[in-house]
From Swiss-Prot:
Protein name (Swiss-Prot/TrEMBL): Uncharacterized protein UU008
Gene Ontology cellular component terms for the protein in this record: plasma membrane
Keywords: Cell membrane, Membrane, Transmembrane, Transmembrane helix
Residues passing through the membrane, by range: 45-65, 76-96, 106-126
Organism of this sequence: Ureaplasma parvum serovar 3 (strain ATCC 700970)
Keyword Transmembrane helix attributed: yes
Membrane topology: Multi-pass membrane protein
Family: To U.parvum UU007, UU041 and UU042.
Amino acid sequence: MNFTSLLQDGIYEVGNGAIVTDQSPYLGITPDYQGAYGFPTHPWGIFFQVVGAILVFGAYLPAVIKVLISKRTENLAIGMWIISIAGLGLLAIFAWLGVSVNPGGFILVALSETLSCIASIIVFALKIANKAKAKAAGMTELEYCNLHYPIVKKLPKR
């Protein structure tokens, strides 16, 4: 018995026992699904991927929309956005590596993490720009935002 026949059989004989390399029959994994569609292929796996991707991206939308409309960033913590961008960037890289290894798998997660990271970068860039403009004007960020982006409240009609 030579080495290549051992690899082709999927069973290595070691002493009195055997090491099984092809465990798909024992784990209930259907190899044709994995080859055709990628991972995860179980309906619950796809459901959780879709819902998770929507929730992750949807969590950033309200903050991004609010900042883009009001241009006010004085209440945003720089550290939180730096950590958020770093985490989302690493998760996006991980997800895209999963997509490259297994086409079809993790594509929604990869898109969600990438879009969330881009949205976070936009908000962070606005925060840094406002902070730099305020410093150049010799003001605090709050004073700068109050001067250039006043909060306009509609008064009730009499």
